[in-house]
Amino acid sequence: MANISSDELGIQPIGKLLVKQSVPAAIGILVMSLNVLIDSVFVGKWIGSIAIAAISVVLPITFFIAALGMSIGVGGSSIISRALGAADREKALKTFGNQITLTFVMTISMVILGLIYVNDLIPIFGAKGSIFEPAKIYYIIILYGVPFLAYTMMGNNVMRAEGKPKFAMNAMIIPSVANLFMDYLLIYVFDMGMAGAAWATTTAYFMSFSYVLYFFLSKNSELKINWGHLGFNIPILKEIGSLGFVTLARQAVISFTYLLMNNILFNLGGEAMIAVYAIIGRILMFALFPVFGITQGFLPIAGFNYGAEKYDRVKETIYTAIKYASVLGSIVFLGLLIFPEALTSLFLSNRADLPAEDKLVNTFVLEHTPNAIRWVFAATPIIALQLIGAAYFQAIGKAIPALLLTLTRQGFFFIPLILILPNYFGELGIWLSFPIADVLATIVTGLYLRKEIKATLV
């Protein structure tokens, strides 16, 4: 789990290197996912299941704004990995400076717009009925912390591009631990309700940003923050935009999917159905952390070796990553198949003073969520090919294939399915949409990746 120099990405054995890169990323994602999971448990236990639903409808908006930082980070880091692989340090430094400037301009602009149109935005994403007021409270406070989260996401990708996965892991662990402490203090001790949950998360975002800033000002980073490299370089911006647009488009589609899902679910079962989906979303983030960790670890290795024209190592990286992630995905599936009831119960409060509406929602959630979990995660053993395949094209700087493969699952398959299947199968149609979309997207990605490997990695 030690940090390595960027040159070692082209030297060390692939299996060992993938573990070194993936384990810190997976631990960071695990801690962050545990943070979201336990945060939701705090909210569910001490505020109520309506509050979980309220947070769920807000997250797609705030995460989309934060994803601007992620997209700039991923797009720029692909350039940085290839530049370091080609020994072009100046281009790497210029790219980093452009990332810093672009993240600031984009996120601040979006936050201002988000605050101005708050009353119009959150109802569109499903904040209706008794969900609206708690969602608005949470949303406004969280927006103040979103720029810090965006910078953390951007910096985290640059750390991995440098071959510093341990520091990237720390950047995710620090805010997660801080958020848990602040949740306990503000929700349980001071009983601040939704405002407490929001301020806890916002404070954690700021702490994460502080650590990332420290890293890039210290001797640990190869890419120092330099005023001379800040600003906009049009060719670099175009490349960041073309590659980062893949990540942004993915988050945009995810946010749009949440919009559709929350509205369809509200029409089917009101606030209770949104609460079911909110719990599944929390479990999804937590359960797939090892697969996402391998995907993150895969990116800098593939990008560096492609830039260094070591194509045999690139192929080995692809196959090894898919194999490791598939095994871990199968283990995750078995766990969710066996213990869905226990996982659902974690989020539900048994407080005697719980409002009657929350008690009714709890009963509904406990009855409907376990079966939904089994369907939603049914294709987990095969999603590794889908994720690694799309990530590969992003790593090597091929923006169009990366974009199309990224949109395949959500945009081309899942959204049409959730618009069609509920008309015939009701609630079950929603949950069936998940594994069907996964299977179809995996087939398409596998065929395209196979064609690309035969054509270019020779």
Predicted regions and their residues:
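Short runs within selected transmembrane alpha-helices of multi-pass transporters and secretion channels
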Residues: 73, 142-160, 168-176, 197-212, ...
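Hydrophobic residues within alpha-helical transmembrane segments
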Residues: 23, 27, 58-61, 101-105, ...
